[in-house]
Each structure stands twice: as C-alpha cells, then as structure tokens.
Amino acid sequence: LCTYSVDYEDNDRYFQKSLFQPNADSDYIGLMAEAIGSDHRNVVLNNVDVAEALVEATLARGVPGFTDVDSSLLLFCRQVHRDFKVCLSGECADEIFGGYPWYHRQEILFADTFPWSRSVDVRQSLLRPGLLPEGADYVQAAYRRTVADTEVLDTDSPLEKRMRQMFRLNTDWFMQTLLMRKDAMSMHSALEVRVPFCDWRLVEYAYNMPWALKSPEGREKGVLRKAFEGDWLPPEI
C-alpha cells in the first residue's frame, strides 16, 4: 500500500492553528503510515510553484475557484500521477460525520445562513460593481430552499433538526464544491480519484444517525474514530 501526504516548505516554522486545522498534519502522518505499514511519500510544495500554477488551475476548473487551494491540489495530483493512475481520497468524511467547526460551535451552527459563508460582502467586492446586485439575496434564497427541503422527524429535538439541516447544507453545497474541485484538478493531471466516503449508502446511513451517536463526547467525526479504536489505529489518530 502506498500513501501520500502534502506539505509546504517551512510549514514547520510558519504553521498557525485555525478552526479548520488546529494541529499540523505532520504530527500524525508518521503515526498513521507506521500503523498501516504503508510505503509513504510526502510531497513538499513551495509558494512560488503554487503561485505559478494559479492560472492553470483556474483553466482546469473552468471557473474561478479556491485559488492556491486549487493550484496546490493540482501540483499534488501531478506528483501522484507519476506513480499511479488511480487512487483513493478521504473527501466528504467531514461533511457526513460532522468534522467541521460549524457542527460544534453554537454561534456558527445556528446562524441563519451558510455556515462557511456568513457574509458575501468580501466575495462580492472582488467583482465589478453592479455585476451581481442581488448576490446576497440569491445566496440566502438558496440557503432557505435547502433548509426547507430537509427531511426531519416530528420527534427531532431542535438540535437534531438543525444537524439534519446542516448535513443537507454540507452535502448539497460544500461537498459538491469539493468534489468538483477534486475532479477537475485530478483529471487535468490524468489521475482518477475515487472517494469512498461519498458512497450513497454510507451518506444515507450517516444522515439517519442521531447526533449523539455521530459525535460521542462532542468529538469531531467521533463515530468514525470509535470505529477504529483498539488495534486498528493509534489512539492519537
């Protein structure tokens, strides 16, 4: 089994914690590779190469996207393609098992809009004035339409109902964006990436799991961690 990870030059010096990444991945990659006995390869990128790939990544996607997040993925896929034509990737575990901070922080969870885009002002400021005068209204209408379309049970508590809505918001919007990004960058690199966490049976099952079961002790992706306790993976993972 061959596994890959990506890092950046001098990341050990300049890494800063954030809501999305409270710890550097490098702290756990070695533990994981050793536990599963994989032939692990770490791809190290630098800022110059990532910046120079911005235009190519945008053209590969066909629309403006995640800028350096796209170009770094493009370079990473290109490195993997040197050895393999097909690989597995872990996209969407955060969406269906509650790994993002907006599943756990009340002030974000109950915000009456998309949790990852609570304001469109900054994004809209990048566009020519008047190009999308109703941009904020469009975003809010899409949010309300998704929430209204979410199936809930009469017995759901307010928290359980909101978690179902959050699940739909993530799978219908955030997850789709990640999948389109992964598909565009990987196929541009002649690499086929498969995403087992997106199997419809797993997604359907996860949707129907009570939040207390999905997030035991309030842990991000708690049920997924529980599934691999014991002899499967190191306790740090």
Locate each region found by the language model.
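Short, intrinsically disordered, charge-balanced linker/junction segments flanking boundaries
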Residues: 234-237
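ATP-dependent adenylate-handling active sites, centered on carboxylate activation for C-N bond formation
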Residues: 1-166, 173, 181-232
